[in-house]
Each structure stands twice: as C-alpha cells, then as structure tokens.
C-alpha cells in the first residue's frame, strides 16, 4: 500500500532472481514517482504535483511535469468519451466525502459518524466544471480558474501510471 493506496501485483518472467529483483526495484521506483506526481494530499521535496495545482487554484498557472500534462489530457478525453461521467474536476465534492470518512475512522463510536449534508455537496458541486481546468501544453502549465475547484485524478491517474510504468518495464526488457 505504499503507492496509490492500493495493492500492486506483478507477474514477470526473468532469467534470474537477481534480474527479477532489479526489475522490480525499477518498477517500484517508477510507481513511487507517479504516486508523488499524482498525489492530491501530500507535498514532496522538489516535486510539483496535483496537490500543487490544487493549492494554486484561482491564483496562478502551475508549471508541471509532462507526465502530469499527458495524464490530464487523457482525463479530458475520458470526460468527453464518458459524457462527463468520469470527471477529475469533482475533487471539491470528493474532498467532502474524504473528510467525513477520515472523521468516521477517527471516531470513538459509530454513533459519532455523520454523512455530509446535501447542501454541502450541492455547494461543492458548483466547482466541478472541467472547462475551468486550463491546460497550456506549450507553456506546460495547468491553471484552475475556479479558486474553489480541486482536482482528484483517482482512477485516471492510477490507470495512466500503471500503463506508463508497464511500458517502461517492457522497454527495460521485462516480460
């Protein structure tokens, strides 16, 4: 669970245990890199990530790594393909659910658990317009025009990261 808060299982064929361990170390390092880039909760020294974009919502464009730009461009395509059902701009709503879940996990008893109100969710939903995610591929920047908007790249980030990590592993000779 040290990357993307999920289990990663790899089945690979190598000539030796040493080669396998070397390949797995490289693959794990790649996953850690993508996890840090797509993280919405944590800062990392020297890393501009999705949290950095969220922290600058409504303030300024953020210069980002190509791996963030490519993933966000895929997310926009997925938004179009799914008629808006897959929306990385839903972060303000998902953040409310996250906060309530965290509070429930910390609660002494289930009696202390609460659900968000419809008013909270509806207010947050006003800040989920993907058109307010301004990507400038030439400048390599991302700007959230709505200061209350938050990105949550969730499934798109994980899926894209796994695809890129697998391509890199294959290029290193892993089968």
Which stretches of residues belong to each language-model region?
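Residue-level recognition of oxygen-bearing side chains
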Residues: 161
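Short, well-structured beta-strand/strand-turn elements
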Residues: 167-175
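Short, conserved phosphate/pyrophosphate- and ester-handling motifs at nucleotide-, phospho-/glycolipid
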Residues: 158
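A contiguous, well-ordered beta/alpha segment that forms the leading edge of an enzyme domain
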Residues: 1-154, 164-167
